[in-house]
Design a protein with these regions (language model features):
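C-terminal and inter-domain tail/linker signature
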Residues: 1-134
């Protein structure tokens, strides 16, 4: 079984110590317009999102097939319930190749995306999130 650290997620995977990232693992997902590129950018975006969670309850976190890792959890952001599924795929060298982060339901996803745009205001990351009032 592969040992993994998902960019600072506070999950069982985080405590396993896997930190091998290529120069630009793209991060895509339902919250984002476009892809976030680069390990530092991905860490900032994921870390910023985690800071807004009031709570996080894991349903599953573990290997998915031969070259992937998946997390399924529910969280709460300012009282709004939100569900998430994160899929990380690895290349032949065992490094993260692609990260997909999807949230549900749509109303919570839109609320969370607007909060993240506010959080990242003045940074290059803000443009990836939904504009408008929270």
């Amino acid at each position: 079984m592969r040992e993994i650290d998902l960019l600072g997620f506070h999950s069982a995977a985080t405590r396993r110590g896997w930190t091998s990232w290529p120069a630009t693992p793209p991060l895509e997902g339902s919250l984002l317009d476009g892809a976030v590129q680069g390990a530092d950018a991905v860490r900032a975006v994921i870390g910023g999102a985690r800071q807004l969670y009031d709570r996080q309850d894991f349903n599953f976190a573990g290997p998915w097939g031969d070259n992937s890792f998946i997390e399924d959890y529910t969280a709460e952001v300012r009282g709004a319930p939100i569900g998430a599924v994160h899929l990380i795929t690895f290349n032949a060298d065992g490094k993260a190749q692609h990260i997909i982060v999807n949230y549900r339901p749509l109303s919570s996803l839109m609320f969370f995306s607007r909060l993240l745009r506010e959080k990242f205001a003045g940074t290059p990351y803000a443009e990836h999130y939904l504009a408008g009032e929270v």
